Amino acid sequence: MEKEQITQLLEKQRQYFYSGATLNLDFRISALKRLHASIQKHEAQIHAALRKDLGKSNFESYMCETGLVLSEITHMLKHIRSYTKEETVPTPLAQFHSRSFRKPSPYGVVLIMSPWNYPFLLTIEPLVDAIAAGNTAILKPSAYSPATSEVIRLLIHECFDPKYVSVVTG
């Protein structure tokens, strides 16, 4: 992907984030459910790619990569409402007439660059957290695990609009 294409992608994601579409909690939950279903659907392809890139068995691929990601998504779906809830915190004495609170809010566009050794886990697990937080994301899987990078690209393309989540390979 050329520099100009990446710049355009980044701008589209910023525009999408600023539209407020990712702030809706039901939107985030729906995105996480789609990702969970897609991972389950393509689990055999993911394991085959991990075998090709790293020589991992199906058992190791599940225990160290896909199983952990599916578990993270399940955990996030269970707790997302409490993680995104506004929280009252103690007010400093100087502002006694005020109310203090902490409100979790997304950053915007998140870049997730992953290493070669756990290419699926270390790409998708941070994505789960970015989606749950209400961000858009650009994923850059390692060039040293090309088969897994391609499966991730196909999986993300199937689940999400590029203005929401995109994959840059190479």
Predicted feature locations:
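Rossmann-like NAD(P) dinucleotide-binding subdomain of oxidoreductase/dehydrogenase enzymes
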Residues: 93-170
